Amino acid sequence: EDRPKFCYLPDDPGVCKAHIPRFYYNPASNKCKEFIYGGCGGNANNFETRAECRHTCVASRKGGPRRP
């Protein structure tokens, strides 16, 4: 696999209480999905935009990461 290992981490809102829409990669569906981030903590599977998430983690059918 060409995608970074952190793409396989679960969505993690972190320990703070903000309400920030973010995106994470879901390996089961090979798609980037929205979740609510608390603003601190969490993990690296956390992207500001769906495009950034796709560029980093979503594999194309040809086997490499898909370009945005």
From Swiss-Prot:
Its main location: secreted. The record marks 5 as: May be the major determinant of the binding affinity for potassium channels. This is Kunitz-type serine protease inhibitor PPTI. It is found in: Secreted. The modification Pyrrolidone carboxylic acid (Glu) is found at residue 1. Disulfide bonds join 7-57, 16-40, 32-53. Residues 7-57 form the BPTI/Kunitz inhibitor domain. One of its GO terms (cellular component) is extracellular space. Serine protease inhibitor that weakly inhibits trypsin (Ki=0.2 uM). May have potassium channel blocking activities. The record marks 17-18 as: Reactive bond for trypsin. SUPFAM superfamilies: BPTI-like (SSF57362). The lineage of its organism: Eukaryota, Metazoa, Chordata, Craniata, Vertebrata. InterPro entries: Kunitz_BPTI (IPR002223), Kunitz_BPTI_sf (IPR036880), Prtase_inh_Kunz-CS (IPR020901), TFPI/VKTCI-like (IPR050098). It comes from Pseudocerastes persicus. Belongs to the venom Kunitz-type family.
